[in-house]
UniProtKB/Swiss-Prot annotation:
Transmembrane segment boundaries: 2-22, 60-80, 130-150, 173-193, 246-266, 278-298, 374-394, 412-432, 483-503, 525-545
Location relative to the cell: Cell membrane
Organism: Bacillus mycoides (strain KBAB4)
Role played: Part of the high-affinity ATP-driven potassium transport (or Kdp) system, which catalyzes the hydrolysis of ATP coupled with the electrogenic transport of potassium into the cytoplasm. This subunit binds the extracellular potassium ions and delivers the ions to the membrane domain of KdpB through an intramembrane tunnel.
Record family assignment: Belongs to the KdpA family.
Membrane protein topology class: Multi-pass membrane protein
GO molecular function, one term: P-type potassium transmembrane transporter activity
UniProt keyword list: Cell membrane, Ion transport, Membrane, Potassium, Potassium transport, Transmembrane, Transmembrane helix, Transport
Identification of the protein by name: Potassium-transporting ATPase potassium-binding subunit
Gene (name only): kdpA
Subunit structure: The system is composed of three essential subunits: KdpA, KdpB and KdpC.
Keyword Transmembrane helix: yes
Gene Ontology terms: cellular component: plasma membrane
Top-level taxon of origin: Bacteria
The organism's taxonomic lineage, starting at the top: Bacteria, Bacillati, Bacillota, Bacilli, Bacillales
Length: 555
């Protein structure tokens, strides 16, 4: 029965992807019906803010993005620092420590939601609502705006206006869908209140303080926007965030909704729907392989316990919630790292070595399917590399969407693709070379190495999940992961926007018999191979020293 539920869940992922992709294309490219519904409200916003809506160059678009996001980071930083004297603080929580406030503000603006604090006792309701939830809408709206400009550039059109795209992402996508999802979560038992904690009497007569808050509205945008941060420290393992299997499936659907839709949006906007389908199917195969790997490992159980003759038919249940079980915990772990959300319904630090390797690889690739917007930019980056390599092998100038890929584009892509591993491995080496980093490690040996690398991988990929055995709420970890999140977020977005702007100016080369097609199975296979060879092999030495070595040791 459990496998039937898994198949149905995956079919739902597939069935909603195309309709959502069509809706996104209409939402951003203009639709009379949508303009009639949302237009008056958007015009009011533009009038108040003074947005003119003129087309921007890629530099103007990028500058608008950085300035708006930077302003939001500063505002939210001071909210966190001053929450102790601000209203909506029934628990009388004090202001955040400076480096933690720095880390948290960047974390949520970068759509990472790395949390070095426990939500229920680290933030006031005001900080949760005005600080955290606000950024949970603003961060994915930023990247969705960027990806629309990126696709327009690839299609040879004007990039558009950042502020118009940002507003449309909020009004036409995130606000309406999150509102509906929040109502469903309330119906499923997720609390939504501004009241303080309630005191309950336990079975043995003791008194217990049960924390609550505006959780349903928080969870809906947490999953839809691929944010992933928890209202509670336990994240989606907490029964108030994720009461049962229905809420669990809904959360996974929300996480996958936009990342799986974007290939179809792309196909429609560039006039090659088949290429969008090829990208979707290719990535789903990689996703499926990851799920099968982690599930097989977790169901097989802990090799040490197996060697002792201890029977555990449910597999490795350490760190997992009984109400979800091993299979759905494995699926959730695959989804949350494939969609770069970072929400967890099981503790990733307790996964088996190979089970923990799958989320780690998903984040290292940062492209299966990746988070809202940013992940799709990486997908096209790998697609262009696949075309470039194929062109070199046959001695032909590579073309993508009928436009020649030349030195300028490949230099930008080369720098972008190297920057991701440089952040992860460079900062991991720094942490391992100083006691400021190693003192946080709770496990010696191979697993300790994986804890460190996982933290920086999660930060660079804007995921936010963690091997929570790491004691990371220290100035060193707060500052270094904050820098990695910021650089990992904005560097690739800006460089790939420059690539799109460069391709926009090029004339379309007529298709000939020798043109390498990017809308068939051959390209899909080369695309997957490029992701594995260029992406995964970059990190292979580290994977051997970490989870693979731990697996062989346990064996």
């Amino acid at each position: 029965m459990i496998w039937v539920a898994v198949v149905i869940t995956m079919l739902l992922f597939i069935l909603v992807a195309k309709p959502t992709g069509i809706y996104l294309e209409k939402a951003f490219q203009g639709s009379k019906k949508l303009d009639k519904v949302f237009g008056p409200f958007e015009k009011l916003i533009f009038k108040i803010t003074g947005v003119k809506g003129y087309n921007q160059t890629w530099k103007q678009y990028a500058l608008s993005l950085v300035l708006l996001n930077g302003f939001m980071i500063v505002v939210v930083y001071f909210i966190f620092r001053l929450q102790g004297v601000l209203p909506l603080n029934p628990a009388h929580i004090e202001g955040m420590e400076p480096t933690l406030a720095f880390n948290t503000a960047i974390s949520f603006m970068a759509d990472t939601n790395l949390q070095h604090y426990s939500g229920e006792n680290g933030l006031s309701y005001l900080s949760q609502l005005i600080g955290i939830t606000f950024l949970m809408f603003a961060a994915p709206a930023t990247t969705l705006a960027i990806v629309m400009a990126f696709i327009r550039g690839l299609a040879g059109k004007e990039l558009g206006n950042f502020f118009v795209d940002f507003t449309r992402a909020l009004t036409r996508v995130f606000l309406p869908i999150a509102f509906i999802a929040a109502l469903v979560f309330v119906a499923l038992g997720v609390p939504q209140t501004l009241d303080g904690a309630v005191t309950a009497q336990t079975i043995d007569g003791a008194k217990q303080s049960i924390l609550r808050g505006p959780v349903a509205s928080f969870v809906s945008i947490k999953e839809l926007g691929n944010n992933g941060g928890g209202f509670f420290g336990a994240n989606s393992t907490h029964p108030f965030e994720n009461p049962g299997q229905m809420s669990n499936i809904l959360q996974m659907m929300l996480m996958m909704l936009l990342p799986t839709a974007l290939p179809f949006t792309y196909g429609r906007m560039v006039g090659n729907k088949k290429q969008g389908r090829i990208l979707f199917v290719s990535l789903f195969m990689v996703f499926l392989l990851g799920f099968i790997t982690i599930t097989t490992s977790e169901l097989h159980g802990n090799p040490v316990l197996n060697g002792m003759g201890i029977e555990h038919v449910q597999g490795s249940t350490e760190g997992k919630e009984v109400r979800f079980g091993t299979v759905f915990s494995s699926l959730y772990a695959t989804v949350t790292t494939a969609a770069e959300t970072g929400a967890v319904n099981t503790m990733h630090d307790t996964l088996t070595p190979i089970g923990g390797l799958v989320p780690l690889v998903n984040m290292m690739l940062n492209t299966v399917y990746g988070g809202v917007g940013a992940g799709f930019v990486n997908i096209i980056m790998y697609a262009i590399i696949a075309v470039f390599i194929s062109g070199l092998m046959v001695g032909r100038t590579p073309e993508f969407l009928g436009k020649k890929i030349e030195g300028k584009e490949m230099k930008l892509i080369a720098v972008t693709i190297l920057f991701h591993p440089l952040l992860i491995l460079g900062f991991s080496a720094l942490a391992l070379s100083t006691s400021l980093g190693t003192d946080a490690i709770s496990h010696s040996g191979f697993h300790g190495l994986t804890q460190v690398v996982y933290e920086y991988t999660s930060s660079a990929a804007n995921n936010g999940s963690g091997f929570e055995g790491l004691g990371d709420n220290t100035p060193f970890w707060n500052i270094t992961t904050g820098l990695v999140m910021f650089l990992g977020r904005y560097f690739s977005l800006i460089t790939m926007l420059a690539v799109a702007a460069s391709l926009k100016e090029k004339t379309v080369v007529p298709e000939t018999v020798g043109t390498f097609r990017t809308d068939n199975g051959l390209f899909g296979g080369i695309f997957i191979g490029t992701i594995v060879i260029v992406g995964a092999l970059t990190f292979f030495p580290m994977l051997v020293l970490g989870p693979i070595a731990e697996f062989l040791t346990l064996k």
